[in-house]
Swiss-Prot record:
Protein name, per record: Tubulin alpha-1 chain
InterPro entries, per database record: Alpha_tubulin, Beta-tubulin_BS, Tub_FtsZ_C, Tubulin, Tubulin/FtsZ-like_C, Tubulin/FtsZ_2-layer-sand-dom, Tubulin/FtsZ_GTPase_sf, Tubulin_C
Gene3D superfamilies membership: Helix hairpin bin, Tubulin/FtsZ, C-terminal domain, Tubulin/FtsZ, GTPase domain
Gene from which the chain derives: TUBA1
Cofactor: Mg(2+)
Function field: Tubulin is the major constituent of microtubules, a cylinder consisting of laterally associated linear protofilaments composed of alpha- and beta-tubulin heterodimers. Microtubules grow by the addition of GTP-tubulin dimers to the microtubule end, where a stabilizing cap forms. Below the cap, tubulin dimers are in GDP-bound state, owing to GTPase activity of alpha-tubulin.
């Protein structure tokens, strides 16, 4: 088997995780208590969904996941929620005091105490796998736990499981909406280790997803539940081919191979279509060309950044439901003729497609309509640099005055780490600039020197 372990860190990671596991269970027909009426072979783990669920002798399906937070309130919601019987109690790890939006607390003081316990649990999950394929890591980089403990765990996973791929689903601070003053510090410090220790990172940002909910689903005031359900659809689409037997399957390592041209250039944009409410879906014909066009729309991007400002280096289209390769090829051919979707000159083809015949499921009583077919796109576009330059700018404004820095230094960090992380991000922005430059291979051959 090619198992995958999911790690959900901090409030954002846990709440997105909740939405994901709820959706996985619906897709596989697994009840909230872990039983699966349709699974006739009890205790035999040879089905495709066993990449994400392990099976006990009693026929209970347990997610291969751990939830970690430095304070108990969010995890207590999982412990008492409707899926409380699904998870093994040891998979829900919480500390007593939170990271207080402080990267240094999550990474050095408070996080250090809990990280060995987490790795211990990960080790147990890994021992339970026959051929561990990699990790999915869910966190936000604006807070303290997601950024600090998130980076710490990633660093330790690199040491313990060096060859296994790590995919991050990372929630970045939004341009306008902010939940903490020190977000820019936490994000810069955390991205510093995301650069080194993840193989692919998918950037999400709340504001972009709010806008999609408002515009496409007509939800006047979207809640985190609305956002997380939309995020979970994306993550579900990406992992469909790992959990179901499909037509054109896509492996986790395949994402890396097809999307990452240089090790550092691994921050992806994602989009999903059709995002449509039930009332509207009734009147619309959502054909393959239509949904394919929709995922390339700047307004469908799940991070606030305009792909028209950059160039595509690679792009992964994952279709699910009633889709045949002929339609996909036609739709992709149309996209290629469009002037709006520009590829870098050194990567002329740039499309990787996956098809899975399992139609998308929706959470009952949720916002999304039940549709026959859907597509999720993950793309590597040079415009992602906008996300970083935005955060860097805010970082610079605060750091010039050394505002709030004493909170970090007081938790055992050194001021040098700030400038080191900031320089790393400046280099990253430069890397993106060079990759998008025209005819890059002629003038400078130093692109491979990383």
């Amino acid at each position: 088997m090619r198992e995958i372990i999911s790690i959900h860190i901090g409030q954002a990671g846990i709440q997105v995780g909740n939405a994901c596991w709820e959706l996985y269970c619906l897709e596989h027909g697994i009840e909230p208590d872990g039983t699966m009426p349709s699974d006739t072979t009890v205790g035999v783990a040879h089905d495709a969904f066993n990449t994400f669920f392990s099976e006990t002798g009693a026929g209970k399906h347990v997610p291969r996941a751990i939830f970690v937070d430095l304070e108990p309130t969010v995890i207590d919601e999982v412990r008492t929620g409707s899926y409380r019987q699904l998870f093994h109690p040891e998979q829900l790890i919480s500390g007593k005091e939170d990271a207080a939006n402080n990267f240094a607390r999550g990474h050095y003081t408070v996080g250090k105490e809990i990280v060995d316990l987490c790795l211990d649990r990960v080790r147990k999950l890994a021992d339970n796998c026959t051929g561990l394929q990699g990790f999915l890591v869910f966190n936000a980089v604006g807070g303290g736990t997601g950024s600090g403990l998130g980076s710490l765990l990633l660093e330790r996973l690199s040491v313990d499981y060096g060859k296994k791929s790590k995919l991050g689903f990372t929630i970045y601070p939004s341009p306008q909406v902010s939940t903490a003053v020190v977000e820019p510090y936490n994000s810069v410090l955390s991205t510093h280790s995301l650069l080194e220790h993840t193989d692919v990172a998918v950037l999400l940002d709340n504001e972009a997803i709010y806008d999609i909910c408002r515009r496409s689903l007509d939800i006047e005031r979207p809640t985190y539940t609305n956002l997380n359900r939309l995020i979970s659809q994306i993550i579900s689409s990406l992992t469909t081919s790992l959990r179901f037997d499909g037509a054109i399957n896509v492996d986790v390592t395949e994402f890396q191979t097809n999307l990452v041209p240089y090790p550092r250039i691994h921050f992806m944009l994602s989009s999903y279509a059709p995002v449509i409410s039930a009332e509207k879906a009734y009147h619309e014909q959502l054909s393959v060309p239509e949904i394919t066009n929709a995922v390339f729309e700047p307004s469908s991007m799940m991070a606030k950044c305009d792909p028209r400002h950059g160039k595509y280096m690679a792009c992964c289209l994952m279709y699910r439901g009633d889709v045949v390769p002929k339609d996909v090829n036609a739709a992709v051919a149309t996209i290629k003729t469009k002037r709006t979707v520009q590829f870098v000159d050194w990567c002329p083809t740039g499309f990787k497609c996956g098809i899975n015949y399992q139609p998308p499921s929706v959470v009952p009583g949720g916002d999304l309509a039940k549709v026959q077919r859907a597509v999720c796109m993950i793309s590597n576009n040079t415009a992602v640099a906008e996300v970083f330059s935005r955060i860097d700018h805010k970082f610079d404004l605060m750091y010039a005055k050394r505002a709030f820095v004493h909170w970090y230094v007081g938790e055992g960090m050194e001021e040098g780490e700030f400038s080191e992380a900031r320089e790393d991000l400046a280099a990253l922005e430069k890397d993106y600039e060079e990759v998008g430059a025209e005819g890059a291979d002629d003038e400078n051959d130093d692109g491979e020197d990383y």
